[in-house]
């Protein structure tokens, strides 16, 4: 994908600085109330299907919205997108903002669905 080479490089650099979590682990932490799952996809993607119990904050506004919706910088936050790129960037950004326990869900919503985990509309 030469047309996305710069984006892919940016994501690869971000992934060096963050921790990823598998969808099954994210599901367990969401179910137990241990983590807040944040869907950073665009609204139309969210409307097409999302993780039950997740919070929507698009990649374009997460830095503006996060402090109001998740004020505790020690809260566990699991970001996810469609495939793992945008969530890696969002995770890195939240870490820079002082959030200490942020993870990016490996493989994004595609991996969540592939693991046959529940979805909602």
Question: Predicted segment positions?
Answer:
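Rhodanese-like catalytic fold shared by cysteine-dependent sulfurtransferases
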Residues: 1-36, 43-77, 85-121
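Short cysteine clusters
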Residues: 81
């Amino acid at each position: 994908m030469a047309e996305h080479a710069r984006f892919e490089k940016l994501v690869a650099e971000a992934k060096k600085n963050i921790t990823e979590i598998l969808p099954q682990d994210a599901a367990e932490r969401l179910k137990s109330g241990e983590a807040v799952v944040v869907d950073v996809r665009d609204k139309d993607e969210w409307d097409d299907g999302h993780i039950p119990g997740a919070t929507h904050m698009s990649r374009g506004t997460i830095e503006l919205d996060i402090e109001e919706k998740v004020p505790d910088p020690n809260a566990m936050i699991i970001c996810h997108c469609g495939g793992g790129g945008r969530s890696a960037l969002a995770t890195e950004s939240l870490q820079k903002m002082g959030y200490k326990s942020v993870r990016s869900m490996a493989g994004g919503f595609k991996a969540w669905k592939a693991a046959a985990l529940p979805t909602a509309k």
